Amino acid sequence: MSSIRLADLAQQLDAQLHGDGDIVITGIASMGSAQAGQITFLSDSRFREKLSSCQASAVVLTADSLPFFTGAALVVRNPYLTYARMAQLMDITPKPAEDIGAGAVIAPDATLGQRVAVGANAVIESGVVLGDDVIIGPGCFVGKNTRIGAGTRLWANVTVYHDISIGERCLIQSGTVIGADGFGYANDRGNWIKIPQLGRVIIGDRVEIGACTTIDRGALDDTRIGNGVIIDNQCQIAHNVVIGDNTAVAGGVIMAGSLTIGRYCMIGGASVINGHMAICDKVTVTGMGMVMRPITEPGVYSSGIPLQPNKEWRKTAALVMNISDMSKRMKAIERKLAKN
């Protein structure tokens, strides 16, 4: 969409219009950079003072923030959610042609649905099934007998190994690898013996996976990613991991094998989670969390020492290193006091 009247935008967003509905909106921008012709949003009332200097032609905000802005506005309950919907309307992501690119190799027995696009130099192996409106970007590899559901898009250079199942309306960013061997080895008197990984990866519907993330195939049981899961860039998801519906995983997270994560969880960036255990539904792990034990109660969990000036951090680290000795001394003092 190149432009839209503010009144028409309000109707599409189910927003209450205040001001001139004939204003033409040509784009969306942050409050600090928005100019005439653009629309912005205020999702945090702490930044209301910025409204007085805002140059946008219109602002999306809540009813209690409306008195702080004199220009045209769209009043909604959740400005951030409305921003997401506006961004979808104004998305400038290029739409690929519905054709087969130069140098693409497609096995004769692969099944392609209607309006499928396969980019240049992509490889589609034997037995693959691609649903309607699937987009396979340039340089992608889709291994034997893999199934990809309708409306799913793989950006350039995604690798999907054999016997993988990806649901409908998924989005997988460039460089991601799905279905590589999990880290499975047996030790024979100092020599590592590889264990073939016989499981698969099963990905549900409406899953989004960021760039350069790796999801390993199961050793025996399948690695499973539930419906509506969102996974950021550069995450490592080991074999046999199960992630429940609508869980969010931020960048750089490492999940060890045979971990089960429940539904509606949020895992902060750079967290490390031990394997062979479970995390229940509705758990939030804050950034750089180190999860070594199962979590059985919903809630917010944190670990680690927040950033401090180096001198203060060194003192804190020294205290942590000596906490066992201090505990022993405290118990000895308590025993003496109890005798008295």
UniProtKB/Swiss-Prot annotation:
CDD domains, sorted: LbH_LpxD
InterPro entries in the cross-refs: Hexapep, Hexapep_transf_CS, LpxD, Trimer_LpxA-like_sf, UDP_GlcNAc_AcTrfase_non-rep
Keyword Nucleus annotated: no
Pfam family, one: LpxD
GO terms assigned for molecular function: N-acyltransferase activity; UDP-3-O-(R-3-hydroxymyristoyl)-glucosamine N-acyltransferase activity
EC top class named in words: transferase
One Gene Ontology term, aspect cellular component: membrane
Quaternary structure and partners: Homotrimer.
UniProt protein name: UDP-3-O-(3-hydroxymyristoyl)glucosamine N-acyltransferase
Originating organism: Sodalis glossinidius (strain morsitans)
GN (gene name): lpxD
